[in-house]
Amino acid sequence: MAVGVEVDWGLHRYEEPLGPPGATLAHHLSHSAGYGLESSDATAPVGTKRVYSNVAVDFAVDAIVGDESPAQWLDDRVFRGLGLGDTALEGRPAAGVVGSTKDLMTFAGAWLRSDGLAVSTRDRILSPFLGDLDGIVPGFGRFRPCPWGLGPEVRGDKRHWMGDWPPDSAGHFGQSGALALFNVRERIAVVATSTVAFGPWAVGLWPGWISTIRTLALAS
């Protein structure tokens, strides 16, 4: 979302070159710039494979903030404006955000309402970028295709943690066991936090639980 604010303010463009030849800011945010999970060495040509990459996210943020503090940048662009008083960056941009369940609920709802972003920017972020690329969702395996937006994952036809939510649903989960999933068209969202790190328990539990949450939300 913070990069979307930069785009709305005219400070950056998703099409601007970044990293390897042919790569852009959009490639980095959609995990298609060719980096490995924790390596800046090329694992695939740019725009040919979806390889989830913390390095790509960190590199994109570093390129945007320059000498500024990433924590302050996120607070200025997102946290303060949405009223996320319990949320802060306490580590690397790709995996260092901590906060409360309440704040995560507010954050998920902001995507539904497009709080802090132009609607057109929100919709672009949640639309697949190079949607036909194959790739791997960490913990859930390989998918053909493996659609991803400009930050959040897009479900598409993947049968995994998003359960039976519609193809245009988007969200993210982390190694902490937290998740956020939302569908703008249906105007529903679900979040969860955990005291147990992501693992086999989540792979087995989330799909059915998340499907049930959607059923209950649409019936309410």
Model-derived segments and spans:
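Active-site-proximal loop and beta-strand segments within enzyme catalytic domains
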Residues: M1-Q72
